[in-house]
Amino acid sequence: MKEQKWIHEGLITESLPNGMFRVRLDNENMILGYVSGRIRRSFIRILPGDRVKIEVSRYDSTKGRIIYRIRNKDSNN
């Protein structure tokens, strides 16, 4: 049986070494997020201030995998 994961939205607050980021979730929790392999392969840039979707394990809610970067509505790209 596959492990159940929670998907949250949050804001990148800090960039750390090795593709790690500090993420503030919408429920005000701070967790450590790492970039998923699909985002890494696609060369998607994630910077502080970006909104992301993050997948969090039920067993360790202090870490999560960033699975999607939400586009900003005010950018021209």
From Swiss-Prot:
On whether DNA-binding is a keyword of this UniProt record, the answer is no
The residue ranges of the S1-like domain are 1-71
Q: Which domain of life is it from?
A: Eukaryota
List localization entries.
Plastid, Chloroplast
The record's annotation in Pfam families points to: eIF-1a
Question: GO molecular function terms here?
Answer: ribosome binding; rRNA binding; translation initiation factor activity
Keyword line: Chloroplast, Initiation factor, Plastid, Protein biosynthesis, RNA-binding, rRNA-binding
Q: Which GO terms describe its cellular component?
A: chloroplast; cytosol
Principal localisation: plastid
Respond yes or no to whether keyword Protein biosynthesis is given for this record.
yes
Q: How does it assemble?
A: Component of the 30S ribosomal translation pre-initiation complex which assembles on the 30S ribosome in the order IF-2 and IF-3, IF-1 and N-formylmethionyl-tRNA(fMet); mRNA recruitment can occur at any time during PIC assembly.
Tell me which family the UniProt entry assigns to this protein. Answer: Belongs to the IF-1 family.
NCBIfam families with a match to the protein in the record: infA
Q: Which PANTHER family does this chain map to?
A: TRANSLATION INITIATION FACTOR IF-1, CHLOROPLASTIC
Functional description taken from the UniProt entry = One of the essential components for the initiation of protein synthesis. Stabilizes the binding of IF-2 and IF-3 on the 30S subunit to which N-formylmethionyl-tRNA(fMet) subsequently binds. Helps modulate mRNA selection, yielding the 30S pre-initiation complex (PIC). Upon addition of the 50S ribosomal subunit IF-1, IF-2 and IF-3 are released leaving the mature 70S translation initiation complex.
- The protein depicted here goes by the name Translation initiation factor IF-1, chloroplastic
Species classification = Eukaryota, Viridiplantae, Streptophyta, Embryophyta, Tracheophyta
Name the gene that codes for it.
Answer: infA
